[in-house]
């Protein structure tokens, strides 16, 4: 007899009864499986080969760093509002320069555009149809699109796999990003050097931790983020408010680390709100922003105090210079009078610095440039051809996923206790059911509850965890560490043993307590059905987590979607009575197939006590009332497997579709004929051009008619000392 009841495997998987839904799901899953295994290790950008910053010095982890100077000019970023037809400027004609060996801090009040400018320079500004970004960006004197370079971007949120130690986190990062380090000894030596360099030796073997598991401190997590970014020896380091959420001591240690990295030859750029005095003293250069406009750019220390002192704004003694500068360039919204006076002061300072910086020009005028396809994506993966293959990535990620899943003691203990507790409760309610007519309804109710409980437990666990993990994966994939296929497959396989344990516990306790069909084979099939259902629910949770942006949204969408599947699960609405427009839902409902399989397993061959001829005498008659007659368990398992593959395929597609996309920089045109072609950043003289009209920010960089309005405004401001600092 042929397997699967005389049908081929393809026939079984493609659907039941020849329905089109099953065939479509199987086709999508098959296509995605081919894509999953056929994909390259790393997707490389198809542009021309870019010059490697480490072509001569890189040896799989060497410390040689090629100096990189980044110059930006007239960066303008606007956000349009279609409903009100208004435009809000996030950045207006911002210019500046970051040099190797120097720590540059972007400072300003909240909402001044610090993070926006940092994201623009790093090519990390999220893509939006409402955003318009323009300006000039050069790396070592060349347009950023023609020369790629290694960069590190340390975000405010420190996201890690919580169950790994600090050393393991760095080791996996080194293996994924530096496949050329083949021996474990070299990798361990490289990781140990990073631990020593970042001051993480004391916590190297400590668990990173999270909100549930106590781990390393916030400052240590920030330094670990830096260490992970330094794996590939980047030339440029971007840090978005690295001291946020840290106490004074930890903030000091983090900034000391950034200062040392700058002294090692890195170009370090960070955004920071209002640092303490000792932190401000570590800055080599600063850029001051207010309401998206440039107020000062140049050396830090006493130079900005001297500059603003020339206009009568004197910093009192024993006052933190950073606090003084922050108050000076902020608008006070406490009253209409303070708003007017502070705005007048800020606008005058902006105009004064714009005029001052436009007095010194570039030695060589910039030539005409056009928009490039990838001008704002200077990623390392565009210039490095990865040598690690698909399977190497898979086994590394499988090891990491298994360590994360198996070590998650608190979560696993809670899941185990809930599985046993729910089984005990249900077993007590349906204690040792007999063979009476009323037991038929009890058995159906118990099997429906078992299917719902198994699915909801797996779903809620996945949607509560995966959105956070997706953020980590998106960051690692954006660095070119690995591709999506190995990650998704490794995660699936690593979680099979842990995921199977809980439905097995549930079945082992519930089955004898309720006295379901008392044969070993039926018990094995019961556990097998709920286990496959648990895997399908987890796959559905992955899809929900890949579809929505946050854990909160996933927790709202996942159970709501599962409720729809419960309604069409075969117990509340008979499949034969389902309206035609909704008949596809039972076919896609994992609850329906699990309930059907459990009913077939329980009722087949069962005899019930009866007194009347119209009573249900056999289990087959009970199955007919549910429209499950003539079905087989293997068909339900095949349907569940088909649904599982569909959800995994949907997860793959959504993760590919929703991967981070970044805004392109539209390069402004400069024909070199105007006198205002730029500035040479020397000491306090900063690259900045005149402020364009608000209604035309994209005009060519031509000379603007300068007036003495700003001078008049400054003359009207009487010199004063900021009080109350």
From Swiss-Prot:
Keywords from the named record: ATP-binding, Membrane, Nucleotide-binding, Transmembrane, Transmembrane helix, Transport
Superkingdom field: Eukaryota
Subcellular location: Membrane
GO cellular component, one term: mitochondrion
GO terms of molecular function: ABC-type transporter activity; ATP binding; ATP hydrolysis activity
Disordered: annotated span: 676-725
Family membership: Belongs to the ABC transporter superfamily. ABCG family. Eye pigment precursor importer (TC 3.A.1.204) subfamily.
Alphabetical list of PANTHER family matching this protein: ABC TRANSPORTER G FAMILY (PTHR48041:SF41), ABC TRANSPORTER G FAMILY MEMBER 28 (PTHR48041)
UniProt protein name: ABC transporter G family member 7
Gene that this polypeptide is encoded by: ABCG7
